[in-house]
């Protein structure tokens, strides 16, 4: 973990991501992360469903030109139904925002989540109770 950036998200939001991933399983899910960056922390405060997203077996796609011009978007989250929480080259090539969060099957705990920067370096995740 060469980057000292920490990503924080509430347990409630993380549970919402897990629930969405479980409902679409075995298809991938994709959401936008809204929040704020301050010093060494990105705090995720909301989830946004992207317009015209397509959820498929082994992929999730959306027209990036349709994303809202909203500077409060700090990144994206998507699921890997295989359980592998490492980013693929496609994931990194379609990086949007400051962070990429990946949730993997069985979508049950913080052990099924990883967060990365645009270089593919893993970031620290803090799950809060707020």
Descriptions of predicted regions:
Residues 1-73, 81-130:
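Conserved beta-strand-loop surface patch within small alpha/beta domains used
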């Amino acid at each position: 973990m060469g980057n000292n950036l920490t990503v924080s998200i509430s347990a409630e939001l993380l549970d919402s991501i897990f629930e969405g991933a479980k409902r679409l399983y075995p298809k991938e899910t994709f959401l936008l992360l809204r929040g704020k960056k301050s010093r060494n922390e990105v705090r995720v405060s909301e989830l946004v469903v992207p317009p015209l997203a397509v959820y498929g077996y082994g992929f999730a796609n959306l027209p990036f030109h349709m994303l809202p011009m909203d500077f409060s978007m700090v990144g994206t989250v998507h699921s890997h139904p295989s359980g592998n929480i490492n980013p693929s080259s496609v994931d990194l090539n379609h990086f949007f925002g400051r962070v990429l969060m990946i949730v993997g099957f069985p979508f049950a705990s913080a052990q099924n989540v990883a967060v990365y920067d645009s270089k593919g370096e893993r970031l620290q995740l803090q799950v809060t109770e707020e």
